[in-house]
Amino acid sequence: ATTMLDPQAYELMLPFLKENYGNPNSLHSFGSDTHKPLKDAMDKLYAGLGASDLDDIIITSCATESINWVFKSVYFDYILNKDRNEIIISGVEHPAVSAAANFLEKFGVKLITLPVNNDGISTPQNLKEVISDKTALVSVMWANNETGMIFNVDEMAKIAHEKGALFHTDATQAVGKIKIILKQSEIDLASFSAHKFHGPKGIGGLFIKKGINLSPLLHGGEHMAGRRSGTLNVAGIVAMGEALKIATSMLNFEDSHIRRLRDKLEDAILKMPDTSVVGKKEDRIPNTILASIKGVEGEAMLWDLNKNGIAASTGSACASEDLESNPIMNAIGAENDLAHTALRLSLSRFNTESEIDYAIEEINKATKRLRAISSTYAYNPNNYKG
């Protein structure tokens, strides 16, 4: 759902909240004093995303803004009064993507949703079967926000280009967790948010490949070369750049320490009877688990864990007020009772071994207690350890 702000990024942003608070567009020294820190931060973003100097990285408030910019500008620039009227998304996109796509249906856009397999991913073959010369945009996430499953976005981008369509990926869960080199990819557009890789909330960006033109979503001043109006959040940009620099420098740590802790937690859950996890470990980003614990309502588990200081969710935090069954579980064809048992657990580099041990203990205790009072589950206390 989010991450704590990295202490180094926090310290770096503080001066721009207190002393160096100038507007970069101002001509006086308070404004010009922000130019070098901004350039340094942008250099870190280009390096962290593996982008070419010829590409654009436009600062936005978050990935949701970036995604809405892509979809609505594609409608105006590539669909309205043109021969193309189709948009393709996967069946497990974040609500920011699915809601933006659903909105455009009201204006005559044909929305095609790709099916997903039992691991919760759409494949390049799924895309080949439905894409056509009418397709304007394909949008498939890089890594799923609930399962952590990684999609083959490079291959899907090639398929989109064969039909003359643009390819966008919601890279929010991938940036800072796996190696990304966008200049070696055919991806046209990639959106991201800083708070997913230990940067501050309220800041993100949109990668735009050289030669791709998008009309602005926000009109006003000539900020970001006229592509995104609004006074720049200097403190946020500086912290985001530093956070991404740190995250990309620690990718090997992510893939060893965090993956080991994640696997320890996952293995402990799977030792309990009637439990499952969506997706193979090796096909997921290193920090995410979407588990199903039969006989235990996801919301009941959340409340039990929360009172013991453990933060978990039943799905996307951006839809956490909706207590319906988990949409990912529905998409992979899980039975309705199982879809209500989803439990999402995510780790960061700041988690410790003792915290994982504590989480295992509390999940086991909560499972035993909740199954014992379940009207739909045959509870056998001998099946549990601890």
Residue positions per predicted region:
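Pyridoxal 5′-phosphate
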Residues: A1-G386
